[in-house]
Amino acid sequence: EYGGSGLGYQEYVPILNEVSQVEPSHGLSVAAHNSLCMNHIYEFGNEEQRRKWLPQLASGKVIGAWGLTEHNTGSDSGGMSTTAVKDGDDWIINGAKNFITHAISGDIAVVMTRTGEKGAKNNSTAFVLEKGMAGFTSGKKENKLGMRASETAELIFDNVRVPDSHR
């Protein structure tokens, strides 16, 4: 329906395992693209978002990233510092995510943000950000010990204006 193979996780995992046996970095990149970016849009996005982004991601024309991890909180979404503040019909996103696969090479990123007080319940929202949005940049590539073929860097958000339709 959205351009994918139609395979489920029972078929996907053995394929990913085979790819990873040859080159673990490629397996990591495939998993970040498919499981983290694409799957979140598929499972939690609305139909308009699925039709807009999934065919491009499934074809490989667009590479996806997932942004949750932060410098001081790791993957604790309740303590994240990246914020999204409503401004009319848009949201303004500020903060940074680190250790993000495809932060440099990715064309879009599903990014988790805090929309309320730190630690409060129901205070996080995901947004799809596209490369080229003003204020949306990536940091330098991390010099890792292993998995070097899977690039990792920081995502930086400096007053990024995002339409509500990307939420």
Annotate each language-model stretch with its function:
Residues 30, 94-138:
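A short core secondary-structure module
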Residues 82-85:
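A structural signal for short hydrophobic beta-strand segments in well-ordered beta-sheet cores
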Residues 11, 131-141, 151-167:
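A glycine-rich, basic-preceded beta-loop-alpha segment at the flavin cofactor/substrate interface
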Residues 60-68, 112:
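A short, Trp-centered hydrophobic/proline-enriched beta-strand micro-motif
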Residues 7-8, 76-78, 89, 102-107, ...:
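Short glycine/proline-enriched turns and hinge-like loops at secondary-structure junctions
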Residues 57, 72-75, 99-102, 115-118, ...:
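Short Gly/Pro-enriched turn/cap motifs at secondary-structure boundaries
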Residues 6-16, 76-80, 156, 162:
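Structural signature of FAD isoalloxazine-binding scaffolds in flavoprotein oxidoreductases
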Residues 1-60, 101-108:
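Internal helix-loop-helix
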